[in-house]
Amino acid sequence: MNYDNYINNSIKTIPPSGIRRFFDIANEMDDVISLSIGEPDFQTPWHIRDEGIRSLEKGKTWYSPNRGFSELLNGISDYFERKFGVKYEADKQILVTVGGSEAIDLAFRTLVNEGEEVIIPEPSFVCYEPLTVMAGGKPVIIKTKNEDSFRLKAKDLEAAITPKSKLLVLPYPNNPTGAIMAKEDLEEIAEVIKKHDLLVLSDEIY
């Protein structure tokens, strides 16, 4: 039986992650410091681990509500208001996911229609392109430059926009370069976004 005949054609176009291949190779070697995957180099703080243990002891091992536990949703809402001065309604505007990749996947599949374009600055997180393809969209890549400190420039964004452009991914602080957008750059990009009525996915995992 040729199982390839049963695979979604869009999946066949997605190559395996090169960085994951390096990760697997490094894991098999001794005395190697792996710089392949961006993850914290510190343990989860004990007060967080203790709370997880307490939840298990209380029997919270079942399905959660679809949006997440109300205590967590309210805590997230309070954090954003305290930290950034913005108010999100816990029961309407916040959704808890199992990690950032699931959040990006859900956002793309919710917002992107067949053939619509998702603009992605590179270098970037390896999942943006395949998740765009799986959502039926078309990745449009903007190569950021070393001389710009790998920051997205408004003129480059403007040049990449077409009538099919739907969404811009803003991955800053950037994975993997660590680049941070200057306020002036963001203000210029905001004008382009408003001019063309683009949606923005702000991936702030770093």
Task: Go through the PLM ranges and name each one.
Residues Y88-I94, E114-E117, K164:
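Short acidic capping loops at alpha-helix termini that bridge into adjacent secondary structure
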Residues F108-T132:
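Conserved PLP-anchoring active-site segment centered on the Schiff-base-forming lysine
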Residues N2-Y3, N8-G99, L106:
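N-terminal small-domain helix-loop-helix segment of the aminotransferase-like
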Residues M134-V140:
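A short helix-loop-beta submotif of the ANL/AMP-binding
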Residues M29, A135, K195-H196:
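Helix C-cap/helix->beta junction micro-motif
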Residues V140, T144-Y206:
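Active-site phosphate-binding strand-loop segment of PLP-dependent enzymes
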